[in-house]
Amino acid sequence: MLSPKDRADLEERISKIVVSKGFYFIDLEERMEKGAHIISVVVHGEPSVTIGDCEKLTRAILPLLESFPWYGDNDHLEVTSPGLDRVLKREWEYEIFKGRVIDISFDRDGKSQTIRAKLVGRENENVVIEYEGNYFRIPFDQVRKAKLVFDEGGKEHGKKQKRSHRKGT
């Protein structure tokens, strides 16, 4: 797994590549899977991210990874879209995914509440939602969890797309 310093450096460099190709950089995730170190780059595009987009980004990011001395035979790059049920982790994600339907859990009057609402965006230190025709502002520090949900009308992301590359293949 990457050190915090290496991770921050890698996120910054990958973000520049992703943005230069016309996409939003959402996250860099790491995991171990069957002895392989998986580096997963999560990206978003409008109206969606295709497999072709993931392939294009993989080709653009891979030379950067291969330039690092720590990148070896057991390292694996995966470029993926956020998917249908992405948990929103950073405040700026609320702006990127505005207009989408979310399930949001938050504290209200000392109790936890979960509702399905339309994400309007963010405003100062609040997430703004539309629920039953009314607009509400929920302070970020009261949000326990917010995740994208699939909208039957097709407004949400399609099937999660990804493209993977293992060094040496």
From Swiss-Prot:
Disulphide-bonded residues: none
Any Pfam family matching the protein: DUF150_C
Sequence intervals crossing the membrane: none
SUPFAM superfamilies: YhbC-like, C-terminal domain, YhbC-like, N-terminal domain
GO terms for cellular component: cytosol
Record GO biological process: ribosomal small subunit assembly; translation
Localization per Swiss-Prot or TrEMBL: Cytoplasm
Coiled coil: none
Protein name in the entry: Ribosome maturation factor RimP
Alphabetically ordered keywords of this record: Cytoplasm, Ribosome biogenesis
Record's function text: Required for maturation of 30S ribosomal subunits.
Family as reported in the entry's similarity comment: Belongs to the RimP family.
Principal cellular location given in the protein's record: cytoplasm
InterPro entries, per database record: Ribosome_maturation_RimP, RimP_C, RimP_C_sf, RimP_N, RimP_N_sf
